[in-house]
Amino acid sequence: MSCYFIAQICINDEAEYKKYLDKVDEVFEKFKGKYLAVDESPTVIEGEWKYGRMIIIQFPSEMEFKHWYESPEYKAILQHRLKAAKCDTILVKGLTKADF
């Protein structure tokens, strides 16, 4: 079952965040991640939205997500994102045909 990594991001240090961006795609593709949406200013329909940047990434399975997020390659660059930005992230499980 697919799963979706969703992040709200507020970048405080562009130079440090660039160090993350320069390498993240290379690591990301290795683990079968697929960008579904990246928006610098999503439209708020209801409630409050804390940060401007929104990212949705699909993985084929929760296992693939964990392999990516816990990989030494990702851990090596994650530090740059954590230093450069405030982030709220969640992992959402996708639906299967049985869910309908």
Where are the language model's segments positioned?
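Short S/T/G/P-rich N-terminal loop/turn motif that feeds into the first structured element of a domain
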Residues: M1-M54, F59-E70, Y74, K93-F100
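C-terminal structural segments of small proteins and small subunits
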Residues: K66, E73-I90
